[in-house]
Structures are given as structure tokens and as C-alpha cells.
Amino acid sequence: MASGGQFPPQKQESQPGKEHLMDPSPQHASPHYKPANKLQGKVALVTGGDSGIGRSVCYHFALEGATVAFTFVKGHEDKDANETLELLRKAKSSDAKDPIAIAADLGFDDNCKKVVDQVVNAFGSIDVLVNNAAEQYKASTVEDIDEERLERVFRTNIFAYFFMARHALKHMREGSTIINTTSINAYKGNAKLLDYTATKGAIVAFTRGLSLQLISKGIRVNGVAPGPVWTPLIPSSFDEEEVKQFGSEVPMKRAGQPYEIATAYVFLASCDSSYYSGQVLHPNGGAIVNG
């Protein structure tokens, strides 16, 4: 497992990055993980499930018995999406339906509705919604962030969470769960990722507020705030020297691997977390944060 200073210098030119081009490849599976049918019979929809944390979440959900659907960016993430589909087909339980991948730009309400409709048409319901897709871009100053980019980042990173939730909830029953991916940056700030950080703070507030709205319906809403994790967003966001040192800033002095984060989603999606709602888990390499 790479530690700080052990990633080869590398750079990808477009967001959200491609996992199959990364060196080393992110680790989506732990050799020590033991499935226990925690999600048997459930339908899970994961946005941005083609790579990184999303891929690992999909994989672990499939191991736990869930039928899985995920979204990806068409024309950019097709290869990663196909690799994830093959991975899920091999991991799924015999009584789970075949996984599906849905190409979508989630920054627009109509597209989110189409995604939800496609999942419901295929599988009948949604038991677990994971809002995970995101974009991030470096900027040295607030003046460098123009209106077009600001709107794009907010559409993908927080508008889509609202859109997906409002449409998925029509098909979610008591006992269902929503899990939102936020970030350590929401708690510590990040001068280089100002607009991204603002959206991640909004996701924390959205998670808390929505949990209060839905608690009477028996639907739980929680979040996960990863620290530095080796995903395609990293070589597509930072320069080669920053990539080389990625993860060295946290107490464990290394970046996390996707599988080290995905188990938090399994916990929050399953009945093991039945007394959790409005909470955020912090798999971040030992960084101390408030919240």
C-alpha cells in the first residue's frame, strides 16, 4: 500500500479521471473482508460508481447480496464502467439481479429522474441511495473561480444530491437509507479547492436536515467524510509533485484505499447502523475533526 511520497508522479488532463490509467491501481477489495449477507434482497443505487470509492462501494454492496445500479459519465468513464460491471457480475449473490450502469449528467433534475426511473423499472424499488459523484478543480484564489465553473461544481456536487433524493424517495420504504459522500475538507477547509470544499460543507448540512425530515418515515440519512483517498480525482486534479506526496498530511502519513472507505457505507446501508441518522463517519487517516 502506497504511503505519502510513494505514488509515481502522474497527471490526467480531464475530470473526473480514469481509474484504468492510474499507477498503482486503487484497491477496491480487501483480502480480509468477510461478507455476511447484510444487504441481501436490497436494491442499491450509487452515483459515480464506476471508479474510486464508488466502485468499491458497489463491489462491497454486491458481496453483501444487494442488486446494484450505478451511474457514470458517458464518453469519459465507459471503460471504467464496463470494468466495474464485470467486477459486480462476479461478486453478486445468486439471488441478486444483474448490475446495471447508467450514463448520466447528474447536474440536471430531469437526468436524475431518468436515472431513478430506469432503476425502478429494472428492479422495482430503491432501498439504498448513495450520492457520491463529484468534481473538483484547483484554484489559487477565489478570483480564479468563474461563474460557469462554480455552477458546474455545485450542480454535480450538491444539486444532484437534492435531485436524486427527491426522485428516489418516491420509491423508498421504511428501513431504506440515504448515504451522502462529503469530505474532510468540509471540516478542515482547503484553500486550493474552495468551491469543492463549499459543496462538501453543504452536503453535511443537507444530510443533517434531510435526516430530520425523513426520520418519521423510518428512512435514515447519514454521510461519510473521507480523508485523502487514492481515486481518479487525484491525478486529474493535482500536479505531479502533489500527487507524489498525496496523503502525507494526515497522521497515518498515507492515502487511504477505496476499500478502507467502502466498509463505512456497508455499515450505514445495513441494519447494523439502525440507531444512526444525521451522522457523518470519518475514515480519514487519523485526522481529528469536529462533527
UniProtKB/Swiss-Prot annotation:
Binding site for NAD(+): 45-69
GO MF annotation, one: oxidoreductase activity, acting on CH-OH group of donors
Pfam family, one: adh_short_C2
Record key words, sorted: Oxidoreductase
Record-listed E.C. numbers: 1.1.1.-
Location of the active site: 196 (proton acceptor)
InterPro entries: NAD(P)-bd_dom_sf, Sc_DH/Rdtase_CS, SDR_fam
Similarity remark: Belongs to the short-chain dehydrogenases/reductases (SDR) family.
Protein name as it appears in the record: Glucose and ribitol dehydrogenase
Organism annotation: Daucus carota (Wild carrot)
